[in-house]
Amino acid sequence: MKIFIFLFVFLLNCDKINNSNTLTQQIDSNTEINEIENPTDFYEKLSNAAISIIDSEVVYTPSYVSIKYPNGDVPAKTGVCSDVVIRAYRKLGIDLQKEVHEDMKANFSLYPNLKKWGLKTTDKNIDHRRVPNLEVFFARKGETLPITQNPSDYKTGDLVTWLLAGDAIPHIGIVTHIKSENGNPMIVHNVGSGQVLEDCLLNWKIVGHFKFMNKD
């Protein structure tokens, strides 16, 4: 299946998330992207799902928002990096809002909420949208993979987390089946320029590498 999108591929420096306009490279074109026509496993389906939600018009909006539960989402044209992951998984019938909430409710002390944010109970509106919580959840419920600087070690459907802006800002994205001109696996993420496909795997400090599929 072929989809046509208005694709922005950015090579950004870490300051973009702090509203810097500095770009090392920008490619802006009408680009044809091939989905995997007959995905053979969950992770190929996840890559297709990530590609399907690319939208450069999504505004990076880190505000706290009250949402329904389960299957709650912030307005479609807004979001942050974690919402890319949440939306892609939801296309495959997995509600990370519900999954993360239930695991946190049963294992609250294993999550960084108390230490990091001073929270003493779960919050269905925001817990699943916080990258540190997703890192704990994916490590507990999925598979933790090696962190390397070799792009070939990052496979279709993998989840990668980074620290940006001097290790101050956690970030997350989905590895796709699409390769850049350099042969690097491209990432669907939102670092401030919408839900975009970008050759950015090694742009920042990688701190997490996971696979996750709901085995229930």
What would you call each of these model-derived segments?
Residues G183-D216:
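Low-complexity, Gly/Ser/Thr/Pro-rich intrinsically disordered linker/tail segments
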Residues L11-N13:
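C-terminal motif of bacterial Sec signal peptides marking the signal peptidase cleavage site
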Residues I51, D55, I86-I94, H101, ...:
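Sec-exported extracytoplasmic/periplasmic mature domains
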Residues T61-S82, D95-T121:
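Acidic helix-start/capping segments at beta-turn-to-alpha-helix junctions
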Residues F42-S47, K105-I187:
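...with weaker cross-activation on analogous glycine-rich loops/strands in unrelated enzymes
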Residues D15-I17:
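Bacterial signal peptide processing site
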Residues N21-A49:
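Post-signal peptide N-terminal segment of mature Sec-exported envelope proteins
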Residues M1-L7:
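Sec-dependent signal peptide recognition
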